[in-house]
C-alpha cells in the first residue's frame, strides 16, 4: 500500500517503512506525527483519489532534525565587475513511515 501526502507545501509518495526528509516540523525527535492531508492511496484493491481523502492518514516517527547542504546563489551584472554571493541551508526533519490507514471499503 502506498499514499501521497502533503506537508510543507510538497507532495511525497510514501510506503510503510520508508525514511524520507520533509520540510522542518516543530516536533521532538522520537515522537510520532500524523499526516491527515492524504491526496491518493493505492493498494491491491485499487486507487482512492480525492482532494483530501476522509478517514485516511499516514503516521510517522521523527528520526532526526538537520540542515541540508548549502545552496549557493550568485548574482552578477555583466560587464560591470559586480558579483554578489549568497547562500543558505534549509532545515529538514527526517521521518520514518510507520503506518498508512485508508478509508473504509465501499
From Swiss-Prot:
<keyword id="KW-0689">Ribosomal protein</keyword>
<dbReference type="Pfam" id="PF00829">
    <property type="entry name" value="Ribosomal_L21p"/>
</dbReference>
<dbReference type="GO" id="GO:0019843">
    <property type="term" value="F:rRNA binding"/>
</dbReference>
<protein>
    <recommendedName>
        <fullName>Large ribosomal subunit protein bL21</fullName>
    </recommendedName>
</protein>
<keyword id="KW-0687">Ribonucleoprotein</keyword>
<dbReference type="GO" id="GO:0005737">
    <property type="term" value="C:cytoplasm"/>
</dbReference>
<comment type="subunit">
    <text>Part of the 50S ribosomal subunit. Contacts protein L20.</text>
</comment>
<dbReference type="InterPro" id="IPR001787">
    <property type="entry name" value="Ribosomal_bL21"/>
</dbReference>
<dbReference type="InterPro" id="IPR036164">
    <property type="entry name" value="bL21-like_sf"/>
</dbReference>
<comment type="function">
    <text>This protein binds to 23S rRNA in the presence of protein L20.</text>
</comment>
<dbReference type="GO" id="GO:0006412">
    <property type="term" value="P:translation"/>
</dbReference>
<comment type="similarity">
    <text>Belongs to the bacterial ribosomal protein bL21 family.</text>
</comment>
<keyword id="KW-0699">rRNA-binding</keyword>
<dbReference type="GO" id="GO:0003735">
    <property type="term" value="F:structural constituent of ribosome"/>
</dbReference>
<dbReference type="GO" id="GO:1990904">
    <property type="term" value="C:ribonucleoprotein complex"/>
</dbReference>
<dbReference type="InterPro" id="IPR028909">
    <property type="entry name" value="bL21-like"/>
</dbReference>
<dbReference type="InterPro" id="IPR018258">
    <property type="entry name" value="Ribosomal_bL21_CS"/>
</dbReference>
<keyword id="KW-0694">RNA-binding</keyword>
<dbReference type="GO" id="GO:0005840">
    <property type="term" value="C:ribosome"/>
</dbReference>
